[in-house]
């Protein structure tokens, strides 16, 4: 029956005591409105068997009168001994011969209508098990996916469930029941299964004894239509599906219409009439016998008050029932009875309410759900768990170390079982505080520990409460202490005589424990202990200090609390105290601070605050007020030791000492601190946060900034004011020599003398007649001497001695006299010299006749520098058969040639392919000779930051120059592409390397003429090389410039003098170097953006220069401005620039600001990029890996020429190789005369020793003979980006064919004082 509405709210909770081991009991719940109408809790033991209690007696006590079971109904292990105990307890008589016979039947389940979980019948020696009113098995909890599990019941003949209508969830397994004839053969399971397509039925070996002569011995009553649970007329199976009309899935037979009619849609398992009140069970929810869609909410909206109010008719949702209260073993979350709180919620076991609370980020403990036995895998997931939502069953063999993950567990919601373990204590549960017992082991135990023979002590020091369930501690033969523990303060459930529900037996004998001195510590009181240590006491006899019982408290760091009898710790910084606060210290551990905010009360701190400093006695004293909150090391106001660590405001004295100041603002620092002859400096000073005062110039009384200028620096002169011109006024200690004192100024103002006066002498006034001495000439007008720039026409001559203008030439007269005297002397010497020469000639002529006749006259040689050494560099001539030019891979183009990607196949290195760049010239014969000269120039130059040339190919279709291929391309594109990954370190490094290469060219007397980032190639992320020597020229030993008046060149990099003089020098290269550095700093931006080529010259003539980049410091920009001085002689040389950028490289962040977040370069990524670029450029024809193989390769082929020389007369040029400090090159990189294999052969790839890389390198031989594997990089220089009409060049010639030029068109390149010639890229 269902609850009548009138009594649905007066459920009684009847406690049930199930006996175990005689005197022990545990509490389950059973709520009844009458003895025949109860709600009961189920079990979850499955087919496991624990203990030896009276199972039949427990089943009767638990389930007699139950109408609904929340959980599983488990009828298991009812064997002969259980039946015997049942008969003895009920005084049932039986023939002694049939003592072991099975029970015929039991009637414990006569009132049962619903099972929320599963029905399990296992090894039950009962001939007939009847459930006369069971209608629904919901299967909310299934056993191995089964809602009905009947297994190994040898003596069971019938399981009768004649009212069963539906099994909502889970399958059916009926196995090894040989005498169960009806349920195995006479039941239509399609009528019972809610979803036959999903739910399965297994009936193996369950009716093999039910056949005789091939016919079933199970006979249904004739009214049952051959479908029944037993042989009686009341055992027929109820049919409510197969007989229904097609329009409905469940129906009932209507007597009024004598037909089957459809049930309400809210019904489950059929119905007895129309409407939701007559359902057998409910499809969704049931409220007081009526099937409904949802349970009424416990809070409803009150339209009058506009808020939620309590609903007196509201219910909790428990399964598919709407109830007034949730069962005690369940929690409550959002008006639903739940077994576990959902994610983001937790249940506080220390409170009396069972509501799931929403977690706060700082308060929610880590909750771990455990449903089954512990395994090695589940243990790993319990790391750091504070609550176990479930149970802990420790049955398998675990090591003590594995179980240490449970040390953080404080609460277990169900139970703990520990069986047959070999550890000595349970310290892995040392923080366990509460066992709730919301579900119990074997329906009774919250804590069960048995058969652990090595267990000596429990060590559950933190256990304070077991809310529900009993404690079982048995057969632990070495376990002491447990019998002395006061369990009444821990176990809430009470048994007989109102004693704790406890079963302790067959552990270590108490007297034997005393003999072994395994007893509680003397500081424990009579409540007992968990072990023998003083921290194992349940309660201390006297004092408790940090969890340990002691006789008395420690005097250091502790305070005695007479109320709680605890030794409480002082504040961590207190050594002794009279209270627990930070201000209750008597003495301190570290530093002592007298806090003025608390009446100068003593406070102990670990370190002094920033406004104080520690004395030798560890007392914190206040810093000087001028230190503000910047910290100090002493009481003074100076910056440094004994004073402030930093100054907010400061004054800097002449001896560079700095003292901190106070001020109301940075603009008033000097005035408020009485420093009239000081000014507020705008420069940063180390240790000063905002600003500081610096002393004015010694010539100024007061000033506003550094300097002596009256107007600009507002300098008030202390001595005199000097006016070199009307717009400039400077304070000085005394007037300079070339000045005069202005009258009526009290000797305080002096002006500069007239410009015709000699500036090394004083003057009387500012007129040309007031000079003490004239600079040029003097004209006397009476007694007045006037200084003039040149003599007047009436006095055309001057006296060289004093510059006086005369009307006669006094110098001519003196010259004539001197010439006569000198002529006479020279004539005498000439006659004597001729006589001596004649005698000498005669002697020489006679001596020659005596020499050997075969002596050949040597031609007269032009004198040269004796230190000049011959150029012994070797030139590699490469046959065209060893080159493959990839015409479809164009890397760049110039006015007279094009650069293609190609492959070099050395003749003597079999199966070797080297990626190269090939520059093909298409010019006439004269230009070819000039290109050959320039290529030879490139070949002899060797430096780390200059691109190396491999060799030449002289073919009919033009001269080809072969160089190393660099996949990373030119620096201009590289800066733009990798801007986000480059910083100050890389930018300054590139400038330094370019300066190093240009310094080498300067020493070799080579003018580059086209230095720019587009003509700088990237070898590696930290290594660049200067290229494009097509414009370079070598200076003769007696010339310092070359003049080019035609050709093509990019004007944005031209020095200002080239526009007018067409003259290239090292100084013009310095100008281009400055522009190149500007490009690097701006990550490849084009200079003079938005300006036409014609306006750049006027822009520079007006004194303008490229602007300071935002990431560039003043010091670095100042170096660029020096490179752009209008006077070439004022520009620094590359030797100076090399040293300056070398200094910049030491601390690049001081000169360039990192505008990007820079990460460390990934060398493997760089190599992969170069490898992919080579594969892409050469269509996979080159395998980069082959260059690291160990295989032997032949030497390079011998050149047709044994030696190539590049003769340059005089100068440092002959010492070309001595200027290279690096050991990466050798003078003769090709061994032309050798055919044997050598380890250091040029361009022979070697096996990479430490780490194999898949990047293709072009090998280059160093000076010391070692082979360098140079990684090749990307796009080449001279790559056209825009049409020629907007290329940024002027005087640009059209590309000519191989048609010979006229003499007027071809001007020769000349040095100074020689005829000017044409060059490919000239102005």
UniProtKB/Swiss-Prot annotation:
Tissue: Expressed in vulval precursor cells (at protein level). Expressed in ALA neurons, 2 ventral head neurons, a single neuron in the tail, pharyngeal-intestinal valve and posterior arcade epithelial cells.
Alphabetized SMART domains for the sequence: FU, TyrKc
Biased composition (Polar residues): 1265-1289
Domain of life: Eukaryota
Main location: membrane
Cytoplasmic compartment residues: 840-1323
Keywords, in A-Z order: ATP-binding, Cell membrane, Developmental protein, Disulfide bond, Glycoprotein, Kinase, Membrane, Nucleotide-binding, Phosphoprotein, Receptor, Signal, Transferase, Transmembrane, Transmembrane helix, Tyrosine-protein kinase
Biased composition regions of type Basic and acidic residues, renumbered to the chain: 1293-1302
Protein name: Receptor tyrosine-protein kinase let-23
Biological source species: Caenorhabditis elegans
Phylogenetic lineage: Eukaryota, Metazoa, Ecdysozoa, Nematoda, Chromadorea
Name of the gene encoding the protein in the UniProt record: let-23
